[in-house]
UniProtKB/Swiss-Prot annotation:
The gene is rpsR. Binds as a heterodimer with protein bS6 to the central domain of the 16S rRNA, where it helps stabilize the platform of the 30S subunit. PANTHER family: 30S RIBOSOMAL PROTEIN S18 (PTHR13479), SMALL RIBOSOMAL SUBUNIT PROTEIN BS18M (PTHR13479:SF40). HAMAP family: Ribosomal_bS18. The lineage of its organism: Bacteria, Pseudomonadati, Pseudomonadota, Alphaproteobacteria, Hyphomicrobiales. Residues 1-20 are annotated as: Disordered. This is Small ribosomal subunit protein bS18. It comes from Chelativorans sp. (strain BNC1). GO terms for cellular component: cytosolic small ribosomal subunit. Keywords: Ribonucleoprotein, Ribosomal protein, RNA-binding, rRNA-binding. Part of the 30S ribosomal subunit. Forms a tight heterodimer with protein bS6. The keyword RNA-binding applies. InterPro entries: Ribosomal_bS18, Ribosomal_bS18_CS, Ribosomal_bS18_sf. SUPFAM superfamilies: Ribosomal protein S18. It comes from the Bacteria.
Amino acid sequence: MVDINQIPTRRPFHRRRKTCPFSGANAPKIDYKDVKLLQRYISERGKIVPSRITAVSQKKQRELARAIKRARFLGLLPYVVK
């Protein structure tokens, strides 16, 4: 019979907290004209990627969504991708 105390236990996996890419000293500013930056936060289907995936803070996520919607309205970004 195997003693339970003899079985090696795994160390618990701790996921490292991601930091917001728009916070900090030399962080990029969210601007609706910066299409290259905004495209990183849009999925291949043209949807805005949620903050739990991109690790953007709640305040900056709202700002980012507003900039993406403004760029779409002005024709800088597509609404849907084919």
